[in-house]
Amino acid sequence: MVFIKVLRVHQEKREGTYMFKNEFATLCNAGKAKADFLEKNKVGYFVSALMAGLFIAFGGFITFTWGANLTINGAPAMVRGAQSFSFAAALSLIVMAGAELFTGNNLVMAGSSLGGSVSWGETIKLWIVCYIGNLLGSLISAVGFQISGVPSGDVGAYYAKIAETKMHLAPQELIFRGIFCNILVCLAVWCGFKLKSEAAKLIMIFWCIFVFMICGFEHSIANMSVLAVGLMNAGDASVSIGGYIYNVGLVTLGNMIGGAIFVALPYYITAKEPKK
């Protein structure tokens, strides 16, 4: 019996030598499933990406509409805290309802290509399709939100002011805010591969999003809809389509670096068995 226990302890130590090996294998399987989904059902995949744009737009709308109402009613000091609680709804919908989000796929697909379950060509193809779907879903959501009349008057002016601020940040600010944002978003996604309980997944989503919102980091897909609403309520604000492309483009670059290089690559290295 003692000998068996010793063998079990030894085996557990061997299995624990390569941390996150099982979780990374699960991530690679998820990436392969996504690539197969796109290959076998292109329309279905695009619709799923479009839905992700809608879900993220919902998060942006509640975040900045709440911020507008707090500002209008004389409580601007509460804005950042309130917004930090609200945007977690967006990623919660992505994870729990299911949809294809570009920023989360920066982790999943880069990790899968590093792990060898999909090619880099498949990853880039999926990123492009997913990004276009997210963009279209975001723009449709923004137009519908504008037609609803919610972002009118002072609320619309608040969106325009937010858009103006975002469009005039320096390039390095946008890139690094994008990097830090997607490190946190992808950590929330990574935790989803480690955790079994749905409640635990939601808790980690909340904390990761809370950090990125409090710090004021930049999410490319969220900006697609929020900046579009700002453009449609421009007024005297210094906003433009060129500013939209400038912000979203640089934040996208930062998000890709954050997800692929700062999350996927480190966990790939950590989980990889060294050659004997």
For the regions a protein language model found, what residue spans apply to each?
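Short, Lys/Arg-enriched N-terminal segments with co-localized hydrophobic residues
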Residues: 1-18
